[in-house]
Amino acid sequence: MGSISNNSGSEDCESREWLPSGESPAISSAMFSAGVLGNLIALALLARRWRGDAGRRAGRGNSISLFHVLVTELVFTDLLGTCLISPVVLASYARNQTLMALEPERRACTYFAFAMTFFSLATMLMLFAMALERYLSIGRPYFYQRHVTRRGGLAVLPTIYTVSLLFCSLPLLGYGQYVQYCPGTWCFIRHGRTAYLQLYATLLLLLIVAVLACNFSVILNLIRMHRRSGRSRCGPSLGSCRDGSGTRRRGERVSVAEETDHLILLAIMTITFAICSLPFTIFAYMNETSSRREKWDLQALRFLSINSIIDPWVFAIFRPPVLRLMRSVLCCRVSLRAQDATQTSCSIQSNASRLTFVDTS
């Protein structure tokens, strides 16, 4: 996927059978290697966490976090997409043929375009499911405890795959069309001929907005939980703080910390996908008669593909110790302000309690 001649017209790109001279598979090979390695590392870390969580929680009867079930499904989706898409591009470079010429009747081109649209949509739907799970866990805890289960989380993956399959099969039924783009190593939805490309891009945008809205709501609820935990420190100072109330406060602080870690991880993945999807969205809404170049089309596809490479590395890099450090940095200013407010509030309540005690005595 090297440099592309700007003199090549769209019709030539759609019908060419041989790759232009000077094309190199270096970038595609690097992306494939990084994607496979990152996803395998992430799956190994998730498997280790699953075993550790199962061992620690066996005595308490708690199931493994539903959030990590969804993360595992996301990493599995990214790995599956990388392994099913990248080898087609590498085969094209190895034979010096375009996707149109790899298989008769454009089968390789159709397969590549369908797989790209399918896994991109499935990834965004997985991120939306993760954001919705966090929103229900924090914002609607009663509904979450009664209706959201680990078994339901296991059903998310086949449901998302079914929805993505139905939506991405529309070009195979005549609504939209897959075509080859320069330099001949990738195919996607035809630009400017039907509304399907704009519909696909709009769906991705709506999902991104929904994920951001869920994350924003979770942030507001976490701030409220943090303030409540700060105010609870001003509770009765006699025997009540030595029994169950202290345990409840510790549990609430642990809950806030765990939810904050999940939110940081989800926010990074969401921002990454939004950045990677932006060039594709611009590509989808640009007019066919604009001054766009084939190289811009290729860069938009690369950005869309990079997301499945970055996601597992985000999970592998942002381990619990790193998340705790980030949480401490992000919450430092809030904690200092809350501490001052709490000390002031506690002093007022303490003085009021003393005055009440003097009056009653």
Swiss-Prot record:
Glycosylation sites: 6, 96, 287
Listed Polar residues bias regions: 1-10
SUPFAM superfamilies found in the cross-reference section: Family A G protein-coupled receptor-like
Keyword tags: Cell membrane, Disulfide bond, G-protein coupled receptor, Glycoprotein, Membrane, Receptor, Transducer, Transmembrane, Transmembrane helix
Extracellular side: 1-23, 92-111, 177-198, 287-299
GO molecular function terms listed in the Swiss-Prot or TrEMBL record: prostaglandin E receptor activity
Keyword Transmembrane appears in the UniProt entry: yes
Disulfide bond positions: 109-187
Highest taxon in the source lineage: Eukaryota
Cellular component annotations (GO), alphabetically ordered: plasma membrane
Stretch list, region Disordered: 1-21, 230-253
Cytoplasmic side: 48-65, 133-151, 224-262, 324-361
Keyword Membrane attributed: yes
Any single GO BP term: negative regulation of intrinsic apoptotic signaling pathway in response to osmotic stress
Membrane topology value: Multi-pass membrane protein
Subcellular location(s) per record: Cell membrane
Transmembrane feature ranges: 24-47, 66-91, 112-132, 152-176, 199-223, 263-286, 300-323
PROSITE patterns reported for this sequence: G_PROTEIN_RECEP_F1_1, G_PROTEIN_RECEP_F1_2
Recorded family membership: Belongs to the G-protein coupled receptor 1 family.
Function statement: Receptor for prostaglandin E2 (PGE2). The activity of this receptor is mediated by G(s) proteins that stimulate adenylate cyclase. The subsequent raise in intracellular cAMP is responsible for the relaxing effect of this receptor on smooth muscle.
Protein name stated in the entry: Prostaglandin E2 receptor EP2 subtype
Gene: PTGER2
